[in-house]
Amino acid sequence: MTSNQHKQSALCGAWPSPISAAMVAAGAAPLSQVVLDGADAYWLAGRASESGRNTLLRQRGQDVREMTPAPFNVRTRVHEYGGGALLVADGTVIFSNFADNRLYMAADGADPVALGTGAGSDTATTARYADFVLDHQRQRLIAVREEHAGAGHPVNTVCAVGVDGSETVLVEGGDFYAAPRISPDGRQLAWLSWNHPNMPWQGTELWLAEVDAAGALSGAHLVAGGIDEAVCQPEWSPGGVLHFVSDRGGWWNLYRFDGAALKALCPRDAEFGVPHWAFGGSMYGFRSEQEIICTYIENGVSRLAQLSVASGTLAPIANPYQEIRDLRVAGSVIALLGGAPTIALELARIDLSTGELAVLARSITNLPNAAELSVPESTSYPTSGGRHAHAFYYPPCNAGYEAAPGAKPPLMVISHGGPTGMASNTLKLATQYWTSRGFAVLDVNYGGSSGFGRAYRDALKGQWGVIDVDDCVAGARHLSERGMVDAERLVIRGGSAGGLTTLCALTFHDGFKAGASYYGVSDLKGLDDDSHKFESHYNEYLIAPKAQAASLYQQRSPIH
């Protein structure tokens, strides 16, 4: 007897479900900013019960300890989206506190103490800090600094911060900076910069300078990048060779710079990088001078592998995840945030020498039975302009119910935010809420999404509100024409940039019967007028310079 013979037939969309609205509303506990310090693992845990406060946890052996008790909130708002709010070295933690923007130090076992003891040291600062690295030789931090004291947009620099709170500007003049990285011998500093109107996934520059004994920079020169090349994730190997990720070949691939020439380590139609929305992300690290542990995205799914620098070959590393973030490497141990269709995002440690995997923290601890979970299928389908779009298709799934013979499920289309972002197939209760009730769900990676190469990402250039909408509409039509869903019961939802896609699909197209826009964009001119510095020229890429295309902004705004 098959399992289907135990199921009852019922109207798709109205099946009783074990996943309640309360479970969805409770959400997942945020996990972020993983750090390995020797054998110790650190991570940020978001606490909804404490107004969303981010606290730093450390696991040492079997003991988990909170390193930043209330009211400390480990967070920064550099570029508004933050990230990169902490540094750990030899048991000492340095972090940015959200309430006052100040940097604090917590020695192993001690309470956090603010850096600097001078006049006014007990007050909040107008400067924000992110992406710290430790300059061991000079006992100082090097960080991205964003000063909000003046009128207009803030001023961004790379600065050195002493333990006494003193500051020295090292690099200035650019609109934005990220990823200052000092070489193991302390003699060179690399960093990223970019200027308006570019976003960091459009064009960035990787710079390198000498650092003298006193800590001053000289001989700064461009290593890679430009207005049409996006460079990210510069890191030094243990032996002092600069590595980075660039999309100069059409995909974000790994490169190394030996001081004279650039070399692509593993040319591949895969993404070893993601858009720089926030600081502190990592997709590779060094096991040794000749071995790089890396994660990359291929066909919308993350892989984990060991890359041989000498041969350029990738050796897969067994793991259960299809989305991997915040990869950290310390010798033969790695830590990462991982998720999969039946695994909500979790923090895991993998011992590369034994293959043993240990889960250190879970974002959701009370999951439904696996029989209630819809496992998505990767799919591609034709859309406007002779293109193909990508998506994850979730069929209806319920352990106790099935569609009546000949009945077709309603379809919910999801448009992700960004818009330069990506939908993953990691388990989300907000999706399973619908599939367990008899809905099909199509989570669309429309043209402009990351994870599919530069050309796919650039498909949205000048086309926001058009290409993304076309791809959602085409996805629903594709499934309807194949008889997989009920063409008379199509709905769409999305948040932020995905909210604009949703509103445009409802306003300018037929087909969807209903939709939900969560904190969505409806007025593109209003968005442009109110954007913060980081995104203040984003619409020039997504639509056009406003002064040249005021009518276009109005045409694509659902509010009009």
Residue ranges and their predicted role:
Residues 444-560:
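Active-site-proximal cap/loop segments of hydrolase catalytic domains
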Residues 149, 197, 363-488, 495, ...:
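Cap/lid segment of the alpha/beta-hydrolase catalytic domain
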Residues 45-55, 74-80, 95-103, 119-128, ...:
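A flexible loop/linker signature enriched in serine peptidases of the S9 family
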Residues 27-37, 73-93, 120-141, 174-189, ...:
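Conserved beta-propeller blade repeats
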